[in-house]
Amino acid sequence: MGSEQNDSTSFSPSEPKLCVKGCGFFGSPSNMNLCSKCYRDIRATEEQTASAKAAVEKSLNPNKPKTQPQQSQEITQGVLGSGSSSSSTRGGDSAAAPLDPPKSTATRCLSCNKKVGVTGFKCRCGSTFCGTHRYPESHECQFDFKGVAREAIAKANPVVKADKVDRI
């Protein structure tokens, strides 16, 4: 009797199911019976299609700069008491806020191709280097340090020439 209760309350071991796409790997129910690779591929394509749709919608409906007549129309709509239209215009403004473009940071030394991560040194020539190649002499920098310094000094200290004195 006791064993019957344990059998009914415990989970029966089920055989692992193969991936639905038929790649040969085992799928899991949490991934819609797909293996991890197929699931990751499907998610990536879904994200790409969603971003493509958003880009198409954005190109079809470009954001126009606000001008005075449009602002006056929004004010008149707000005065008329249509709270739903004023809230919808606010929601549209927050969605139209420009996104910051992703920064492309160099994570490898230009000379030895070593990963530098956060500890990379940025040279005035515009490249990132590791601790060994951070000095201009070690990475054969083509940046003209002397020329830039001369220009900075000349700009900071303008030459003052006195007028010539007329002889009597």
UniProtKB/Swiss-Prot annotation:
Region (Disordered): 49-105
Residue sites binding Zn(2+) 3 per the record: C123, C125, H139, C141
Zn-finger (AN1-type) residues: 103-149
Keyword Metal-binding attributed: yes
Zinc finger feature spans (A20-type): 13-47
SUPFAM superfamilies: AN1-like Zinc finger, Glucocorticoid receptor-like (DNA-binding domain)
Record field: compositional bias (Polar residues): 60-76
Low complexity biased stretches: 82-94
Xref: Gene3D superfamilies: 1.20.5.4770, AN1-like Zinc finger (4.10.1110.10)
InterPro entries: AN1-like_Znf (IPR035896), AN1_A20_ZnFinger (IPR050652), Znf_A20 (IPR002653), Znf_AN1 (IPR000058)
Nucleus keyword on record: no
GO molecular function (one): zinc ion binding
Ligand binding (Zn(2+) 1): C19, C23, C35, C38
Key words, A-Z: Metal-binding, Zinc, Zinc-finger
Residues that hold Zn(2+) 2 according to the record: C109, C112, C130, H133
Physiological role: May be involved in environmental stress response.
Name the record gives this protein: Zinc finger A20 and AN1 domain-containing stress-associated protein 1
Species name: Arabidopsis thaliana (Mouse-ear cress)
Name of the coding gene: SAP1
